[in-house]
Amino acid sequence: PPEGDAGTGMAATNSIALHTGNISAGTSVFAMIVLEQPLSRVYPEIDMVTTPAGRPVAMVHCNTCTSDLDAWVRVFGEMAAAAGANLEKPRLYDILYEKTLEADADCGGLVNINYYSGESVTGLDEGRPLFVRRPGARLTLANFMRAQLYSTMATLRIGMDILFKREHVLLSKLLGHGGLFKTPVVGQRLMA
């Protein structure tokens, strides 16, 4: 289903049973996991909500997900059009996403920070998208696109690590929805 608000995503993915969850990934990104019990303490990175039946749900919400990625896809679309290859937007996304499957696991040393806006999970008040690399990094299209996709997920990982490493939350099924998952396999594989 398309990205929606927290309640819509929970219902649309049927992520209301114990140890299930969903990730909504579009302009912003959030993960919601149904818990056995409330967390042991308050974490500023995690919001607590409930299922319709009242079970506790941990929600990690990040303000920026695909905005920076979308900007780069537009640039590549402009380049393709300038070369006479007018690609439909979904095809352009598929080409660029699928290219990430050829990338180095570490993105060849490329790093992207996708913050278009402030990010409470990392304590930043304002966004500053940033792409960096060392002179010896492997700058390829595959590595560049993987760095872009990883940046959509990196901040979410901070909150998820709190749930799994500090709170020992159990998860048996996690379903993804939203624009990040429109191209089959790629978003799911990298998010996993």
Model-flagged regions — what are they?
Residues P1-A192:
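Active-site core segments that coordinate phosphate-bearing ligands/cofactors
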